[in-house]
Structures are given as C-alpha cells and as structure tokens.
Amino acid sequence: YTPLAAHASMEPPVAVAEYREGTVTIWAPTQNPQAVQDTVSAALGIDKKNVECHVTLLGGGFGRKSKPDYVAEAALLSRELGKPVKVTWTREDDIRYDYYHAVAAMYMKAAVDEKGRPTAWLQRSAFPSIGSTFAGPSAPSAQYGAGFELGMGWTNVPFDIPNHRAENGPAKAHVRIGWLRSVANI
C-alpha cells in the first residue's frame, strides 16, 4: 500500500499577475508555461496569445508546479482589482489543494533461480490514473491507467526477467491526482 503523497515543495504556490485591457502578464515558478497560457486564457476569456508568462526560478516543483491553478487565481484577482496581484498560498492551502501522488494497492510475487537471479515477476495493482486529471474522470484511462503508467518501472529494471506480468484494476480518484517527480520510480 502506498498512501496519498503531497508534493510539499520548498516554496508554496506563488504567482504575480498584471491584467491590463485584455492582456495579462504573469511571473510564476511554473514547470509548464504553455498550461499557464491555456488555463489563464480560459479563466479570463481571452486569447492565449494575450497571456505572457515569465518563468521564474522554482524551489523544487516535483510536478506540482505543472498545474497552474494558483496562477489563474492571481490573474482573476488582478482583473477584478484592476492592479497587479501577488498570490502566495499558505502551506496549509498548498497541502489541502495539491495534486496528490495517487494512492496504490499492490500485490507482488517473484521467483528466483538457484543462483538467485530473478526469473519471474507478477505485479497486480490498483491506483487512480493520472488520466483522471488530464483526460477527465470518464475517460477509460482514468479508470484503468494508461499504458505509459503501467510501463513505468518496467523499462529500467536492472535485471533481465524472462517472465513478467503487470495487471491493473480500476480505482477512482477521489482527490486531484498529479505527477510526483522524484528519484527512481515512485
């Protein structure tokens, strides 16, 4: 069993936005400036060519800073207040509204030969897919996981395992699911 895990980045989500006459300029530590343009333009009802994003240094994002919800908040506030706005989330809000690494339940079974080399590996798992965030909750990949998710961890195993099988069952996401970038396969 793997529990939900929050990113808890060194710095909480923060953004500065300045809205002027149908355009907005953003300064934010983001891992995905294109998503900033898409999300902010949709939130403000403007063309994404009118969203300028300056990427600042970020104190560890681990995948969390690829989701621009905090940036859209700053842009909306700037438009409503008619002046530049800086939004800094509290640590409590950062944890509460994170895109969590998915909870997972797994069963694993392996076999080794007389020399201790792995000969077989069976892995059964159930986890909410990242597809629930990107493709929407009704997409098939949101329930069963996408192929790339099932392959993570299999592509760089340091052993030649002649017999391996990975099975995945459905699991619904009850919170926002997101990438949790880290060392190795997490």
Predicted regions, residues:
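Short Pro/Gly-enriched beta-strand edge/turn motifs at strand-loop
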Residues: 1-5, 87-94, 141
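Short secondary-structure boundary/capping elements
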Residues: 5-9, 69
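Short glycine/proline-enriched turns and hinge-like loops at secondary-structure junctions
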Residues: 8-10, 100-101
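Short glycine-rich loop/turn motifs
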Residues: 11-15, 105
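Alpha-helical support elements that line or immediately flank enzyme active sites
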Residues: 15-81, 138-152, 181-186
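Beta-strand segments within the central parallel beta-sheet cores of soluble alpha/beta enzyme folds
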Residues: 26, 49-56, 83-92, 119-124, ...
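Gly/Pro-rich active-site capping loops and adjacent beta-alpha segments
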Residues: 35-41, 46, 93-185
